[in-house]
Swiss-Prot record:
The protein's assembly and partners: Interacts with AZI1. Interacts with PDLP5. Does not interact with DIR1. (Microbial infection) Interacts with Grapevine fanleaf virus (GFLV) 2B-MP. Interacts with Cauliflower mosaic virus (CaMV) movement protein.
Originating organism: Arabidopsis thaliana
GO terms under biological process: defense response; plasmodesmata-mediated intercellular transport; transport of virus in multicellular host
UniProt entry tagged with the keyword Protease: no
Disulphide-bridged cysteine pairs: 33-108, 84-93, 96-127, 149-226, 202-211, 214-239
Primary role: Modulates cell-to-cell trafficking. Required for systemic acquired resistance (SAR) which is mediated by the signaling molecules azelaic acid (AzA), glycerol-3-phosphate (G3P), and salicylic acid (SA). Required for the proper localization and stability of AZI1 which is involved in SAR. Mediates callose deposition during downy mildew fungal infection around haustoria. Haustoria are unicellular protrusions from hyphae and function as the site of molecular exchange of nutrients and effectors between host and pathogen.
Keywords noted in UniProt: Cell junction, Cell membrane, Disulfide bond, Host-virus interaction, Membrane, Plant defense, Repeat, Signal, Transmembrane, Transmembrane helix, Transport
Tissue-wise expression: Highly expressed in cell suspension. Expressed in epidermal and spongy mesophyll cells, and the cell wall interface at the base of the leaf trichome (at protein level). Expressed in haustoria-containing cells.
Protein name: Plasmodesmata-located protein 1
Length: 303
């Protein structure tokens, strides 16, 4: 059985992980569906798959990674994992993962009547679920599933060197847990070097050393696939990487888990906007009052 991935871009924005609204982590990036369905006359496989999804969604409220096996019979058992980005809070992780089971059915088809596909993967911007039937052919953790590159080159003579340094920081960061954006449940790193913002994430099943190697391989593929493009995202079987170049410097980027800081920023903006509104209102009132007084003065001057 060979897993055939069918890829498409549902939403494209730059930078991919950096400056995005709170709901963007639920946007669909790609899906992969096996070209074979599991015969399921008794409905056992479908029930195991349903139980698998229920367990994965439940655990996503407490952690950013889990691996689950549903069923005991080798012919109907299902193995699955979910992984959330390291900068998502538990509530965001749950919100993201809980969207996927219905998407699997919608994008890959299946059900008790016509059988479910024996393996599938649905990847959103902030999380993914992948599952496979017991005994399904295993693929390399560094097999490339999907990539997207920016349409423009950086036009910066020093870009390659800056990107290389940023890549090195990420490779070390996913191994040591050193990150500007949080982590947990698989190596995660988000940070910047000069004008390059970079992100790396591994599946929680990888150890630190394997994670570093996977991310390194991802960045090598990003260089070969995207050349000097100003941005790129590469998704491998067990890790994914992203980079974005900003000609005027990386803007202030908050991790999605920085709730307090973001709320404080939002309050500051709200106060600033409110202050501008009040100031404008006062100015208008003063202008009206001045106009009225001027008319009154002109009236007296006429006598």
């Amino acid at each position: 059985m060979k897993l055939t991935y069918q890829f498409f871009i549902f939403w494209f924005f730059l930078p991919f992980f950096a400056i995005s609204g709170d709901d963007d982590y639920k946007n669909l990036i790609f899906k992969g569906c096996a070209n074979q369905k599991s015969p399921d006359p008794t409905g056992v496989f479908s029930q195991n798959l349903k139980n698998l999804f229920t367990s994965l969604v439940s655990q996503s409220s407490q952690s950013s990674f889990a691996s689950v096996t549903s069923g005991t019979d080798n012919t109907t058992a299902v193995i699955g994992v979910f992984q959330c980005r390291g900068d998502l809070q538990n509530a965001q992780c749950y919100d993201c993962v809980s969207k996927i089971p219905k998407l699997v059915s919608k994008l890959c088809g299946g059900g008790r009547d016509d059988g479910n596909v024996v393996a599938a993967r649905v990847h959103l911007a902030g999380c993914y679920i992948r599952y496979e039937s017991s005994g399904f052919r295993q693929t390399s953790g560094t097999e490339m599933l999907f990539r997207v590159c920016g349409k423009k080159d950086s036009n910066d003579p020093g870009f390659v060197g800056k990107r290389e340094t940023a890549f090195g920081m990420a490779e070390n960061g996913v191994k040591t847990g050193s990150s500007g954006g949080g982590g947990g449940g698989g190596g995660f790193y988000a940070g910047q070097y000069e004008s390059v913002y970079v992100l790396g994430q591994c599946e929680g099943s990888l150890g630190n050393s394997d994670c570093g190697e996977c991310v390194k391989d991802g960045f090598e593929k990003a260089k070969s696939e995207c050349g000097e493009s100003n941005s790129g995202q590469v998704y491998l079987q067990k890790c994914f990487v992203s980079y974005s170049y900003y000609s005027h410097g990386v803007p202030n980027i908050e991790p999605l888990s920085g709730g307090e800081k973001r709320q404080h920023t939002e309050r500051t903006i709200a106060l600033a906007v409110g202050g501008v509104f009040v100031l404008g209102f006062v100015i208008v009132c003063l202008l009206v009052l001045r106009s009225a007084m001027k008319k009154k003065s002109n009236k007296y001057d006429a006598y």
